């Protein structure tokens, strides 16, 4: 959430940011409501001052034995006006808050202008796409022939965009989760959390999923519960409504969770394979930092996610998202895209974002630089470290062999009981 004082003071900067994003939002309506709210507050304060003055005058007249009926009548009238205005102020505040929750974050000055993902800027590449002496196949074909992915039974049990991992496929999924968590905890210094998979609406609002993306979420009927779309939600809200000791920053958390997304806008896209499922696993990295450190911490976050791909020997590229492709809550985002030879494209496997104080304002997460300092909002960051299903798909496609088997990356073999090759069983 943006600071209302900032919007009030810099309306044209906010308007320009909305235009760069291609966001449709009635900023004038918000500014008008803000004016109305402040005018009503001024009026009610003036009435309260008058009520206090009349009350003192009534007390003086009564003490002197003089009549005070006219002032008592005025007192009743003023009190009634205050009650009515207080109700109007509450309604205006609710409407104003609802609008504030719909304003996206301000893009960082380094974010390139653009309307779609085709305008994103490539920053760097790592690794060479493997050269095959045969036509590489997509992971869904490899997985089904090796009997380690079962999309048909996933559809039977749950519906479209669900699947089973089986045998070595299930073990590979588990190996990837453990490998990622061990790397981030042991080498990168994150504290591991295992979060709830159900959160309340306040948590979803705190990270920016609600109210804007309600259609993409799975809600438990007649309950204040949502299935998490990412561990970012519970882990960020882990510190909601808290004031942190500045000496403990940055705080870094790594968490595995299953993720659940309705994919309401994805009809017809990526209908095969593991790329766009309603349920998938992900290891998430979340940071809480001082404002002056957040940009440096973003670069470190990207490097932490990159190391997963490098250790797996998976070719990838890093792209800086343009204004039109930037997430609602993000100020700046890097995407990591892994090479998928069976599809001949780079596919997103991680998004690493700096949200500045946008989420912290919504979730009321603050810190004190020293014990007597004023509490200020932290900056929050998060990134996928990585999306597990997409990583599994990338391993199958990049390590496939001419005979249809798949070589297990060396760093995963200790997690696979020493298995070096996945064959059909």
From Swiss-Prot:
Q: Taxonomically, which superkingdom? A: Bacteria
Listed pathway(s): Aminoacyl-tRNA biosynthesis; selenocysteinyl-tRNA(Sec) biosynthesis; L-seryl-tRNA(Sec) from L-serine and tRNA(Sec): step 1/1
Choose any GO biological process term that the UniProt entry carries and state it.
Answer: selenocysteine biosynthetic process
User: Where is this chain's protein located in or outside the cell?
Assistant: Cytoplasm
- Alphabetical list of Gene3D superfamilies matching this protein: Bira Bifunctional Protein, Domain 2, Serine-tRNA synthetase, tRNA binding domain
Q: Which UniProt keywords apply?
A: Aminoacyl-tRNA synthetase, ATP-binding, Cytoplasm, Ligase, Nucleotide-binding, Protein biosynthesis
Q: Which residues bind L-serine?
A: 230-232, 284, 384
Could you say which enzyme class this protein belongs to? ligase
Q: Which GO terms describe its cellular component?
A: cytoplasm
Q: Which GO terms describe its molecular function?
A: ATP binding; catalytic activity, acting on a protein; serine-tRNA ligase activity; transferase activity
In short, the EC number is 6.1.1.11
Task: Provide the binding site for ATP.
Answer: 261-263, 348-351
Pfam families given for it? Seryl_tRNA_N (PF02403), tRNA-synt_2b (PF00587)
Residues annotated as coiled-coil are none
Q: Is this entry keyworded Transmembrane helix?
A: no
Query: Is-annotated flag, keyword Nucleotide-binding?
Result: yes
Its annotated function is as follows: Catalyzes the attachment of serine to tRNA(Ser). Is also able to aminoacylate tRNA(Sec) with serine, to form the misacylated tRNA L-seryl-tRNA(Sec), which will be further converted into selenocysteinyl-tRNA(Sec).
Question: Regarding domains, what does the record say?
Answer: Consists of two distinct domains, a catalytic core and a N-terminal extension that is involved in tRNA binding.
Q: Report the family membership.
A: Belongs to the class-II aminoacyl-tRNA synthetase family. Type-1 seryl-tRNA synthetase subfamily.
What is the name of this protein? Answer: Serine--tRNA ligase
Which species expresses this protein natively? Desulforudis audaxviator (strain MP104C)
Q: Taxonomically, what lineage is the organism?
A: Bacteria, Bacillati, Bacillota, Clostridia, Thermoanaerobacterales
């Amino acid at each position: 959430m943006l600071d209302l004082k900032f919007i009030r003071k810099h309306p044209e900067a906010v308007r320009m940011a909305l235009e760069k994003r291609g966001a449709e939002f009635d900023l004038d309506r918000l500014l008008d409501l803000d004016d109305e709210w402040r005018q009503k507050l001024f009026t009610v304060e003036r009435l309260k001052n008058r009520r206090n003055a009349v009350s003192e005058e009534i007390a003086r007249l009564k003490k002197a034995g003089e009549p005070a009926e006219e002032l008592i009548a005025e007192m009743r009238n003023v009190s009634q006006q205050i009650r009515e205005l207080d109700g109007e102020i509450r309604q205006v505040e609710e409407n104003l808050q609802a609008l504030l929750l719909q304003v996206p974050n301000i893009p960082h000055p380094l974010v390139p202008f653009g309307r779609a993902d085709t305008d994103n800027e490539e920053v760097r590449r790592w690794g060479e796409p493997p050269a095959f002496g045969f036509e590489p196949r997509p992971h869904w074909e490899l997985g089904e022939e090796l009997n380690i992915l079962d999309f048909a039974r996933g559809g039977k049990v749950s519906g479209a965009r669900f699947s089973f991992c089986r045998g070595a496929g299930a073990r590979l999924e588990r190996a990837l989760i453990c490998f990622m968590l061990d790397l981030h905890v042991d080498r990168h210094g994150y504290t591991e959390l295992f979060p709830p998979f159900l959160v309340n609406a306040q948590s979803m609002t705190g990270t920016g999923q609600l109210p804007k993306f309600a259609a993409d979420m799975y809600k438990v009927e007649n309950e204040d519960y949502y299935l998490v779309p990412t561990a970012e939600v519970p882990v960020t809200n882990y510190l909601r409504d808290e004031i942190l000791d500045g000496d403990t920053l940055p705080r870094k958390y790594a968490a595995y969770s299953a993720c659940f997304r309705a994919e309401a806008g994805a009809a017809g896209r990526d209908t095969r394979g593991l790329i766009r499922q309603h349920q998938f696993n992900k290891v998430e990295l979340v940071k809480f930092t001082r404002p002056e450190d957040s940009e440096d911490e973003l670069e470190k976050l990207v490097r932490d996610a990159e190391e997963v791909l490098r250790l797996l020997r998976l070719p990838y590229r890093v792209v800086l998202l343009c204004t039109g492709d930037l997430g609602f809550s993000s100020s700046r985002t890097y995407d990591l895209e892994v090479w998928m030879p069976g599809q001949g494209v780079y596919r997103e496997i991680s998004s690493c974002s700096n949200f500045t104080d946008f989420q912290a304002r919504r979730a009321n997460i603050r810190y004190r630089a020293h014990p007597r300092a004023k509490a200020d909002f932290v900056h929050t960051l998060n990134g996928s470290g990585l999306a597990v299903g997409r990583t599994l798909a990338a391993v199958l496609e990049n390590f496939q062999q001419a005979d249809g088997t798949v070589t297990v990356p060396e760093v995963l073999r200790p997690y696979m009981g020493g298995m070096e090759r996945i064959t059909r069983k």
